[in-house]
Regions:
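Acidic, metal-ligating active-site segments
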Residues: 25-63
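Short hydrophobic beta-strand that contains or immediately precedes a catalytic carboxylate
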Residues: 20-23
């Protein structure tokens, strides 16, 4: 907790008006005569309520890979959104995209993100144990920042190279206002500075 406190930068974001788009997906299925009737949707919605992308798939299969299909559709929605918004917010973690997706999908995602460098991954939960493992930490990183801080701000930038040099994940834990729950913000690439994350916090403050 002491280490987490020393890694924390106090920062109160100032709202900056940008055209942001949020992307999320959902899926559902029900058993039907020995098969599964399923549906998957992915949407991209701008902060003013305009729907940029609305994708739907459905079918009848014996063993549909719905989570993978939902992820693919999120990437499709992201591809269609990067040119139409200043900032594209992906719900969830970049780790899960790289860990559970096939190589072609990961490559497609990397190409989409690097096109405009305006894609940000935001998650409300995190199981990563990267920052304090050399201190014998047993809980996830987010646990220590939650206990060490209540002020708005963000943690020291952490760069993870486990997926290779073209898939480096840079992340911080952040709090937008005092006593709010932490969120995790992930960007693709390396070499980011504190100011880069301050700009993002200003843009996502609503």
């Amino acid at each position: 907790v002491k280490e987490a406190k020393s890694n924390w930068t106090d920062f109160s974001p100032t709202k900056q008006d940008v055209a942001a788009a949020g992307i999320d997906s959902s899926f559902n299925s029900t058993k039907f005569q020995g098969a599964e009737l399923w549906a998957v949707t992915a949407v991209s919605v701008k902060s003013d309520g305009e729907i940029l992308v609305d994708l739907h798939e459905h079918g009848l299969d014996s063993n549909p890979e719905l989570a993978s299909l939902a992820s693919k559709m999120e990437i499709d929605a992201c591809q269609e959104s990067v040119d139409k918004a200043d900032l594209v917010l992906m719900d969830g973690s970049l780790y899960s995209q790289f860990l559970t997706r096939q190589k072609p999908l990961a490559n497609s995602l990397v190409n989409t993100i690097t096109k405009k460098n305006n894609v940000v991954f935001i998650s409300k939960t995190s199981n990563t144990k990267k920052q304090f493992e050399d201190l014998g930490a047993i809980a996830g990183d987010i646990f220590y920042y939650n206990h060490a801080t209540v002020s708005p701000g963000f943690s020291k930038i952490h760069e993870d190279t486990k997926f290779g040099n073209d898939m480096i994940i840079s992340s911080v834990f952040a709090r937008l206002a005092e006593s709010l729950p932490l969120i995790k913000i992930e960007l693709l690439g390396s070499g980011y500075a504190d100011n880069d994350f301050k700009l993002i916090l200003n843009k996502i403050l609503n």
